[in-house]
């Protein structure tokens, strides 16, 4: 995968005193719009991506694996439709999210039922299930910190991240022994 070299760059920058942070979701696949630079031919080539590793995530081709013809059609006629690309390895995500400067992230968007990427709804439950309960790579307190206070501090968002008088009380209650992600890829 390509994440290890990226982590090396961040580590080197932080070692020089640079204020560099990162975030990661919990999925080795990712999604974005067909018309973005992410899916231009040079980027696909530079990252050794294959059309067969991509699936249409929205629109009339939802769930269809791409070939060159469908790729061209989506890029040029349906640039606002999403494509999911399968790349990376789970161990890379686990390594990245153990870094003290790494925050948990998710995607946002309005999608019809059965469309979009499961990261929209499944990221945080998957993070807690995999990183805390199953793999024991993080303690619960550290995991919650990476989802709450760390982003609030990093992005200087006032009134967020802790339970204190005058702060917004954004609470999520969950059973640490039962939390799980139910989100799935489009059919």
Residue spans for each PLM region:
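Acidic, glycine-enriched loop/beta-strand segments at the rims
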Residues: 84-87, 138-144, 152-186
């Amino acid at each position: 995968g390509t994440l290890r070299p990226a982590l090396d760059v961040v580590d080197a920058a932080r070692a020089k005193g640079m204020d560099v942070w990162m975030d990661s979701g919990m999925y080795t696949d990712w999604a974005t719009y067909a018309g973005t630079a992410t899916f231009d031919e040079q980027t696909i080539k530079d990252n050794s991506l294959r059309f067969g590793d991509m699936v249409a995530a929205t629109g009339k081709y939802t769930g269809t694996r791409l070939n060159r013809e469908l790729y061209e059609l989506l890029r040029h006629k349906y640039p606002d439709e999403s494509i999911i690309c399968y790349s990376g390895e789970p161990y890379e995500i686990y390594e990245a999210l153990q870094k003290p400067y790494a925050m948990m992230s998710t995607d946002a968007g309005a999608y019809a039922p059965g469309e979009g990427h499961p990261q929209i709804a499944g990221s945080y439950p998957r993070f807690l299930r995999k990183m805390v309960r199953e793999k024991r790579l993080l303690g619960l307190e550290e995991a919650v910190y990476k989802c709450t206070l760390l982003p609030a501090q990093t992005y200087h968002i006032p009134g967020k991240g802790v339970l204190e008088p005058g702060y917004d009380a954004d609470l999520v209650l969950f059973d640490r022994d039962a939390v799980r992600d139910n989100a799935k890829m489009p059919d």
